[in-house]
């Protein structure tokens, strides 16, 4: 694997290996007074974010630093992109500056793929490119950390029924999770109003439903999504209140879930809209576990791309 641009870059076997790798990193760090491994010493990791981020950017930075990499942050507002430089010129500049890995977030779908095609393969000196979210397309490391969290909470993903609820249309998280969780043997159902489902969703390995209440009693997990108002130019539902009434996870709806079921959210959460504060803070919600797992999972991804299958503590 030269890059991680899409869930399509993974097989079921390689995805499971990454989940296992992340847990090995977690174990390798346990009990260390200084959380530092020499794994990526001498490697340069650059985060290149053209959209705002808290969880993804911070976890990649922490992941790189915990493996002793030199981590450099590049933001659109402080780079020459703000002066009109093209994305290609920026990417080639970062390659020439010695990047071993480029972690890219961009509002345009396909941007990470394009950067990977420009900067070349690692075997000809090009950096590994990791898609940290491209438009409404994909967010593969988010899906991996969600799968890790589900495996830890449920014991296994095979055969589990998992709902992805909310703004499917604008969600790269929904697409990557649908592909990965289905690959790992889960039964995935998308729950959303028709206006928030993408064209072509019938080709996804999922089923579709419009009633959240009808689905909740049969679920093992539910992944709640934020309504991405910043990507909307028109009215996709009558009002926030009506959306919350029909698709928000309230305390009453939480009680409809089986006792073992877990609630996930990729963040940021809009409390009071897609999830009630009491639900967000419930022990049945794994939001902070997702953040912790995000660091270990991104350590695993960087390790696999830059080093390969060796001793994680080495």
Swiss-Prot record:
InterPro entries the UniProt entry points to: Asp/Orn_carbamoyltranf_P-bd, Asp/Orn_carbamoylTrfase, Asp/Orn_carbamoylTrfase_sf, Asp_carbamoyltransf, Asp_carbamoyltransf_Asp/Orn-bd
A biological process term (GO) from this entry: 'de novo' pyrimidine nucleobase biosynthetic process
Gene3D superfamilies, alphabetized: Aspartate/ornithine carbamoyltransferase
Binding positions for carbamoyl phosphate per the UniProt entry: 55-56, 105, 139, 142, 267-268
PROSITE patterns, per the entry: CARBAMOYLTRANSFERASE
EC nos: 2.1.3.2
Annotated GO MF terms: amino acid binding; aspartate carbamoyltransferase activity
GO cellular component assignments: cytosol
Catalyzed reactions per annotation: carbamoyl phosphate + L-aspartate = N-carbamoyl-L-aspartate + phosphate + H(+)
Pfam families: OTCace, OTCace_N
Subunit structure: Heterododecamer (2C3:3R2) of six catalytic PyrB chains organized as two trimers (C3), and six regulatory PyrI chains organized as three dimers (R2).
Function of the protein: Catalyzes the condensation of carbamoyl phosphate and aspartate to form carbamoyl aspartate and inorganic phosphate, the committed step in the de novo pyrimidine nucleotide biosynthesis pathway.
Family matches, as HAMAP family: Asp_carb_tr
Family according to the record: Belongs to the aspartate/ornithine carbamoyltransferase superfamily. ATCase family.
Protein name, as recorded: Aspartate carbamoyltransferase catalytic subunit
Species of the source: Rhodococcus opacus (strain B4)
Lineage: Bacteria, Bacillati, Actinomycetota, Actinomycetes, Mycobacteriales
